[in-house]
Amino acid sequence: MIEIDITKDMIGQCEAKAKDIGRLRNSITKGKGNLAGIVGEYVTHQHLKGSEWQNTYDYDLIENNKKIDVKTKRCSSKPRDNYDCSVAETSLHQDCDEYIFVRILNDLSKAWILGRMGRDAFFKKAKHMKKGQVDKSNNFKVHANCYNLTIKELNTL
């Protein structure tokens, strides 16, 4: 897990891009998480020195010819390794090769790049959860149909 302090300059660079996106179709947070999502992409792009920031409908970054979708969740504290990383069922159409998962504090002061996993490997290992279902491993109530995998099961960057 890589911890990153987020600066006002970083947020400033991401704000215009987040506004341009507007409300994404199939967004669990109805567009309220756009800035956090863009900051997640930004810090991941900065960490992956050779990556290209594409921000398409299907993926966010390209690294070594792999299309990477960055999945960001907001949080209120440092993530623990038993917390889940999720891919919403509504994102299954996305044409990417790999996922990188990020958590960002609600106040946007800190981010954690949690790990990565190839798309096919993720869905082979992930647990399918339905909206309203409570995950017994962490008592989290699922907000949308999704596939979950714990942070400790991810590959490191």
Regions found by a protein language model. Give the residues of each.
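Nucleic-acid endonuclease domains
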Residues: 1-66, 71-157
